[in-house]
């Protein structure tokens, strides 16, 4: 075994955590040559359930899984980690305002940011999954000033996968034939799934799909509202598909991107495409396996700019609501 990675997962006994841990342990995230240690963080009352998950992980006898531990002590869970997968957050409840949700989770992610800075390995990278993930990542990052800003990501990969599937189904092709799908902005109902730069079998999606009214209307709204549609159908939020997107996102970060393609995740803005510096904003990204860069130079037309500005403004509003938590 040539490499080993220590991974912290918060909210490990929850539905996303349950769907995620076995895939990390099997090697799907970091590849067949990388051993894994899992350090799980859970609330005290969820420790028994997390121990049950560990029993199942043991019973899988994964060759790549060297060790699993669970703790309600954040310093223990984050000690010497190379990756922090921040899955756990407080979900929005009936009657709760967005500002309330931001502040409740803000306290959690303030603590987690400080603990990452204090305990993690010097090469730590962080993917925030718990919603509202862009602003949760912003809060954690600003409370861990010693961790470089290019190590922080929030997940828009589920939106990318949803968009790819919608385009593939409309075009009558396989999802593997769809590439270059960018999700701009916030992981929320304001996100902008960009079909103008997307490709189907290497051709512009707008050439392959002639129904441009669908692209500008139902395509965007379906992707934006897919999470709510799943809750309505299933009675619970996306879990397996979210876990799958976590695997995809980390794999895309640590693996060289196919030439000419990109993947979507939110990261720290340095002003690219006119976005406020310091926001955690959804961009198209490419990786050389070590360093991740924002794909620049893409055209955003007047239609796209209108959508782009809506999601940009929402993220600025969220930042303003939590400004007292930004270190």
Swiss-Prot record:
It catalyses: (S)-malate + NAD(+) = oxaloacetate + NADH + H(+). GO terms for biological process: malate metabolic process; tricarboxylic acid cycle. Pfam families: Ldh_1_C, Ldh_1_N. Substrate binds at residues 92, 98, 131, 162. GO terms for molecular function: L-malate dehydrogenase (NAD+) activity. InterPro entries: L-lactate/malate_DH, Lactate/malate_DH_C, Lactate/malate_DH_N, Lactate_DH/Glyco_Ohase_4_C, Malate_DH_type2, NAD(P)-bd_dom_sf. HAMAP family: Malate_dehydrog_2. Belongs to the LDH/MDH superfamily. MDH type 2 family. This is Malate dehydrogenase.
